[in-house]
Amino acid sequence: DVGEKISEFSSQLVELAQDQLESWDFDAPGVDVLEWAFNYLSENKLIDTKQTETGFPKNRLIDDGEGRKMVYLSGTTCKDVNLILRNGDIIAELREEVQFGEYDVTILGKSRKRNMSHDLLQYINSSILIVNNYEDQKFDKILLPLDYKDGMLKVAKYAVRVAIALNVGIDIFTVLEKNKSSNKGSAYFSKIVKFIRRSGVQYSHEEKEGNIVEQIIKKADENKIIVMKASDMSPIKRFLKGSIPLSVMNKCDVPILIVK
């Protein structure tokens, strides 16, 4: 709907009102979250101290025209730290951001909503690290559930990178269904173990019989990080049978890296 053109006097009033609003320094929705993130990074010395002297740089908040607002920072443990703000549905926006940035890993806090956890695993096209109750724990092992199926070598590579970063060992853990034989001597398993051994990371391997989810949860403790493969079932099968990574995530309170 287009109304009549306003008078010159009215136009001046509108401009005056806009100038007044700008002088009040209102923040766009969500900017306070970026400021909180900036303060957290600053307090933990994760960004260059030269960029923290004057506080959160609102004047450097950039709108890229793609529905994203950003602040570019220099990190201390990595080269770049970008604070990115999107508004909208969390699943849709995360999915778009992962596709836009081509991220390898998305790090998220554990959601209390089961449906949201399911959607995050299903629709975000990257590996996902779910951080549960993290408060500067000292992790002593990586728990690597191994099922002898294709795709486990990539999971092992992620496990090794995390183990090296934290200077810890890896517990390889295999759960066998009742009355099923082990594939421990298979060429594929040997390849995975050889890769881990050559990395210099200390490791052990244990096999147990029983329910996969129950055994993984029993094996995990508060000082371990689980690194496991994402479910390769179709969405319909996951809905009917349930996803092992999702079940472990919902019942465990340790960080879980789900590798896709």
Region annotations inferred by a language model:
Residues 181, 214-216, 234-238:
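Short active-site-adjacent structural elements
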Residues 1-27, 49, 141-206, 219, ...:
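Small/aliphatic-rich secondary-structure junction motif
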Residues 52-68, 72, 76, 81-93, ...:
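Charged docking surfaces used in two-component/phosphorelay signaling
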Residues 50-52, 82-85, 130, 172, ...:
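A structural preference for short, hydrophobic beta-strand core positions in alpha/beta folds
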Residues 46, 126, 168, 201, ...:
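Short glycine/serine/threonine/alanine-rich loop segments
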Residues 26-50, 62:
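N-terminal positively charged helical leader segments and presequences
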Residues 83-137, 220-260:
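Gly/Ser-rich helix-loop-strand patches that form or flank binding pockets
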Residues 37, 94, 159, 192, ...:
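Aromatic/hydrophobic pocket-lining residues that form π-stacking "cages" and hydrophobic walls in ligand
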